[in-house]
């Protein structure tokens, strides 16, 4: 655990490399609406593809029959020369098996290739200069928490003297719209992902991730989260619950906004 929670601030000048990992599926095959193209439009509007922050994007495709919903990705790869990859499955996955497959992939990546994983959903909004702001926050605070989140729909607590970070009870964590962790963290959920209790009560990926860590490290009570949130859940239907209903699901109430740059890269010292 000492390699994960180092309690050390990362120098602002140090160059980190991130993997943005996004599980996805052709939602029309799950009685929901495809929205990932709008997510990428938001990424573009936020300046992500022109950012100097070093990151790759991997889409973990859930074994959809029709994968043409991802054809638009080629436009971004051609226009911006960015590393955007699609990791396909040869069988139909659900949210839990696909996330487990994502963790297995991350575990096989050479050690120290990525500094942090940014686990996101395929239906999110992001703030302006998202990568610059995320990079600044991660360098200052991510080493003080087993995992962190830049999307915070649950209760948090102020930390004296800190403006852009708050504490949350780990037991309250849910929503993987923007979860931050070091690659070696995946070893824990991989070990217990299909625990009988999770299967019996049909836990979703966020709850399994959280409780795999809590099960191993019972002394861990808090996580560090951003304030305000840099990411918002679109909340436009669900491929997990097979519905097209708008505004049925979780959402945070402290999202900074798609047109706002919170300037963490200037304000976080």
Task: Give each language-model segment a name.
Residues 125-202, 206, 211:
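Conserved catalytic core of nucleotide-sugar-dependent glycosyltransferases
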Residues 2-3, 22-24, 30-39, 193-269:
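C-terminal catalytic/acceptor-binding lobe
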Residues 114-125:
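Short beta-strand-to-loop acidic/aromatic patch adjacent to the donor-nucleotide binding site
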Residues 16-22, 43, 55-59:
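Hydrophobic targeting segments
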Residues 28-36, 69, 91-99, 126, ...:
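Phosphate/oxyanion-binding active-site loops and adjacent basic polyanion-contact surfaces
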Residues 38-53:
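Short, acidic, metal-binding catalytic loop of nucleotide-sugar glycosyltransferases
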Residues 63-114:
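Active-site-proximal specificity loops/subdomain of glycosyltransferases
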């Amino acid at each position: 655990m000492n390699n994960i929670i180092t309690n050390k601030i990362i120098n602002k000048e140090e160059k980190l490399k991130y993997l943005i990992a996004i599980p996805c599926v052709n939602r029309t095959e799950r009685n929901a609406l495809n929205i990932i193209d709008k997510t990428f439009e938001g990424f573009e509007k936020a300046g992500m593809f022109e950012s100097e922050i070093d990151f790759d994007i991997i889409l973990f495709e859930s074994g959809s029959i029709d994968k043409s919903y991802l054809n638009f990705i080629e436009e971004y790869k051609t226009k911006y020369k960015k590393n955007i990859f699609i990791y396909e499955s040869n069988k139909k996955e659900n949210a839990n098996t696909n996330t487990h497959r994502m963790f297995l992939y991350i575990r096989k990546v050479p050690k120290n290739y990525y500094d942090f994983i940014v686990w996101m959903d395929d239906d999110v909004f992001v703030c302006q200069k998202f990568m610059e702001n995320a990079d600044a926050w991660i360098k200052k605070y991510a080493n003080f928490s087993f995992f962190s989140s830049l999307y915070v729909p649950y209760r948090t607590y102020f930390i004296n003297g800190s403006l852009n970070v708050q504490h949350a009870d780990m037991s309250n964590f849910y929503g993987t719209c923007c979860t931050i962790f070091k690659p070696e963290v995946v070893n824990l959920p991989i070990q217990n992902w299909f625990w009988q209790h999770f299967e019996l009560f049909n836990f979703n990926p966020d709850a399994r991730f959280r409780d795999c860590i809590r099960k191993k490290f019972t002394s861990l009570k808090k996580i560090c989260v951003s304030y305000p949130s840099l990411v918002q859940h679109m909340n436009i239907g669900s491929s997990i619950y097979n519905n097209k209903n708008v505004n049925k699901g979780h959402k945070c109430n402290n999202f900074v906004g798609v047109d706002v740059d919170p300037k963490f890269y200037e304000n976080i010292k």
